[in-house]
Amino acid sequence: WEDYYKAEQKKWVLYTEGLSDFDILKTFAGKLEYKKAVEILEGILFIHPTGNNVPDDARKHFYGLRDAVQDLKGIALFDRIDKQLRAGQALTEMMWKKREIENYFLCEDVLLNYAGDTKDNDDMFSLNDAENRKIAMKEAIDEVAKALKTLGKNDIWSPDNKATDDVLEPVFKKYSEKLGLPIVLRKNEYYKLAEFLPKEGIDAEIKEKLDAIVKIADESKGDTNE
């Protein structure tokens, strides 16, 4: 019943595969200084993580709610999938042009910036450690790139790779081994890497998807305060 209550209150719902996708969207909105999108995503909204990229599952949930809340609107964001999405419906369905949302911050500079991050600690030991971490990360990246090439796979930075499974997981496994540490960043934490992508590196498609979210939110007549 909680979902019906949220649907009645908000009048719109956002579907993503997981909460990390939502966190990445929030990070990008902040970096772009897209105030309306930040206001919406930082507010109390109705988000429903589907746990998969199956459009029928999002549709079933949405239209089940819409039977009770007939003015409900929604937007669903999917990874690039081999499924036909529907257009012109109460549920706006969109997919990423790249394999998944993590591909939009997948680049060497982001990983090196992450490895070299000293946060607020800039003493000499931390700076030396940061350089060593960057060296370890570069070695990990090069080893994974070489392995992919040997296996006849895509280039490591290809938008057709599944960024999480094909690149980030093996890179962080090797990186952690080189540092003699347990895995330092796991799949449900990859969203943190988006912080290390500069504003000018954000793909125009991100703004397009944020525009679509803002449009749906603006068209709804829900309560933005509860």
Model region roles, listed by residue range:
Residues 84-226:
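C-terminal accessory helical subdomains adjacent to catalytic cores in phosphodiester-
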